[in-house]
A protein has these predicted regions:
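A domain-level signal for the mature, folded cores of soluble proteins
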Residues: 1-36, 55-162
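Beta-strand signatures of extracellular beta-sandwich domains
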Residues: 39-41
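Short loop/turn segments immediately following beta-strands, especially the blade-tip
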Residues: 43-49
Length: 162
């Protein structure tokens, strides 16, 4: 499963016991040099209404508690004024930038989600330190290095199920 910077919500008809080991695996399309780590959150339907409206808990991964891991991170994206323009962003750490519009890779005119009516939207969560680098030196081949364990769509030698 490739998530594309969004989220997936799935429910089970039973609880998953915490044995202290690897109790759940969420595989994606990762391979060595191409990890897109997703932080996993879980919730128990305590009120029994079948809705995801109870307390959510972030599962610990190998980067939990490290100084370079930012808890309560927030990034705000801004709607471009015209089609085929970069999406500007700011975060709560004082950083800003833009997501380049790459017409050669995508046919849609906007990266900004069309279903969001507001001119900006903010996402909050945990931010892992980036491990990607340009192996080509010219921006044509990027390597996304894996984390040790505990993330979805992450090629971990420890957390592999096969």
């Amino acid at each position: 499963m490739h998530n594309g910077s969004f989220f997936l919500r799935h429910s089970f008809d039973h609880s998953i016991d915490n044995s202290g080991g690897y109790d759940i695996g969420i595989l994606g399309n990762s391979f060595s040099g191409s990890s897109e780590p997703g932080i996993v959150w879980v919730m128990q339907d305590e009120n029994g209404n079948g809705l995801p409206d109870d307390t959510w808990y972030e599962l610990a991964g190998s980067e939990t508690g490290k100084p370079e891991t930012i808890q309560n991170y927030a990034v705000t994206y801004y709607r471009p004024s015209e089609p085929k323009q970069p999406v500007k962003w700011t975060d709560n750490q004082g950083n800003s930038g833009e997501i380049d519009y790459l017409q050669q890779f995508h046919r849609q005119e906007y990266y900004y989600p069309l279903w969001i009516e507001a001119d900006s939207y903010t996402l909050t969560g945990t931010c892992l330190q980036a491990r990607n680098y340009d192996a080509s030196g010219n921006g044509s081949y990027w390597v996304n290095v894996e984390y040790a364990w505990g993330y979805a769509d992450n090629f971990s030698p420890i957390a592999r199920l096969t």
